[in-house]
């Protein structure tokens, strides 16, 4: 795909990296490049979260209890605040026998790689497969858990 005045945004991803380029024709301060690592590892650990001030131990215990009770959880926050990392941390509390379906537009959760012995269906939305379609199909997969990642406006 061309990257020029007519196509001023280029988004590229690899298995563990997301790259976004914005052309100088629309980024008047000059070419903008954004890199985001998306490794298939759990970077958050309970002791690190409490020790680094990420959150209080009671918050972590509350979230773990919410997972045990199959509560719906929405994780919101600013860019770079650790939403995906918190989600990856919480997935360890999903029982192996319970089917999980993930729906993402950019593959970042890596559920199957981080939980190789768990029942999982990973879906990716695309130009020809919308979030609406993915959710409709997901329900036919009989999930115990549905994980929706962030959605970009183009989807």
Predicted feature residues:
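Conserved lysine of the Walker
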Residues: 83
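Short, glycine-/Ser/Thr-/acidic-enriched flexible segments
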Residues: 26, 40, 80, 152-153
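P-loop NTP-binding catalytic core
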Residues: 2-69, 114
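Switch/coupling sub-region of P-loop NTPases
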Residues: 70-79, 89-155
